A protein has these predicted regions:
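A short catalytic or substrate-binding loop motif that flags glycine-/basic-rich loops and adjacent residues
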Residues: 13-16, 134, 143-147
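Conserved beta-strand hairpin/beta-sheet module of binuclear metal-dependent hydrolase folds
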Residues: 1-51, 152-167
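Short, active-site-adjacent cap segments at secondary-structure transitions
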Residues: 67, 88, 218-221
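Active-site metal-binding motif and surrounding structural segment of the metallo-beta-lactamase
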Residues: 39-85
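Short amphipathic alpha-helical segments
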Residues: 46, 71-74, 93-95, 156, ...
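Metallo-beta-lactamase
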Residues: 31, 37-39, 43, 51, 88-144, 148-234
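Accessory terminal helices/loops
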Residues: 201-210, 217-287
């Protein structure tokens, strides 16, 4: 684990540069956010927390994708908070999530997978405080980008963004569980933009200077944090423009059909990009 701010530590898993965040209060009470990914890594995290004399007081799952709802008995039997919307979404799709977890990171305890406690009322776009047993000074911003009931944690000058604002992944829209378009939100692009606005408001309101994405490098400094927002908005704009063009296009058209973004050099990210471009085109043409 490495410290990124006073009381905020980050552990990075070998799979997909996945980041787990540990927030520690003065009395050693710790909040563990999105522990992952393999059982060995999660157990190692528990051992590292114990070795520092901290005690896990609560967990937090940013959103209902399988790699964000893992746990280990070694972390203790504590409430693991998530939004009611996220918990409902996971409940409706838990077997698929468990199969994905078992395939990519075998050996987790099925009984602990996604065993989450609903947060109290948290309107979309608002930021609300986490209550004990979570450490003091933790707030969550609830939004509708990427997955149902996604939240970000803001604490101690750090934004823990979940699966947004990554230097490795372009914005990944909520295109329905497992790509089931019938269950996708009506306006995933608009929801994503509103989420970016809500998070940027929180960055300004709470003087955030460090951003930890769910996957990828930590952004340190206000300029680096702002650059993540700029890059994600530019991608969404280019994606929307490209979706408005027919796939083969017309000669002489000055609206770009391609999306320039260095994150698309990754083969998996490029595949996700192609899928959401096709999703948006289908929505526009009523397919
Ligand atoms: Zn996700």
């Amino acid at each position: 684990m490495r410290q990124v701010a006073a009381g905020v530590w980050v552990a990075t898993a070998e799979i997909w540069t996945s980041n787990t965040v540990v927030v520690v209060d003065d009395d050693g009470a710790a909040l563990v956010v999105d522990p992952g990914i393999t059982p060995t890594e999660v157990d190692g995290l528990a051992a590292a927390v114990a070795a520092r004399g901290w005690r896990v007081a609560a967990g937090l799952a940013t959103h209902p994708h399988w790699d964000h709802v893992l746990w280990s008995a070694a972390l203790g039997d504590v409430p693991r908070f998530a939004t009611p919307t996220a918990i409902a979404a996971l409940a409706g799709d838990v077997e698929r999530g468990w199969q994905e977890a078992s395939s990519a990171a075998p050996g987790h305890d099925r009984a602990l997978f996604g065993a989450l406690t609903p947060l109290g009322s948290a309107p979309v776009g608002a930021d609300v405080p986490l209550v004990p047993p979570a450490p003091r000074g933790c707030r969550v911003v609830v939004h509708e980008a990427h997955a149902p009931g996604h939240l970000a944690l803001v604490t101690r000058g750090v934004l823990v963004a979940g699966d947004m604002l990554s230097d490795q992944e372009v914005p990944l829209l909520d295109v329905g569980p497992g790509g089931d378009r019938a269950r996708a939100p009506l306006d995933p692009l608009g929801g994503y933009r509103r989420a970016l606005a809500a998070l940027e408001d929180a960055v300004a309101r709470y003087d955030v200077a460090v951003l930890v994405p769910g996957h990828g490098a930590v952004a340190v400094g206000r300029d680096a944090v702002a650059a993540r927002f700029t890059a994600d908005r530019a991608y969404l704009h280019a994606l929307e423009q490209a979706a408005a063009q027919p796939p083969s296009g017309h000669a002489g058209c000055d609206v770009p059909r391609t999306v320039p973004d260095e994150r698309l050099a990754d083969r998996w990210v490029a595949g996700e990009h192609a899928a959401q471009l096709d999703f948006l085109r289908a929505r526009l043409t009523g397919r």
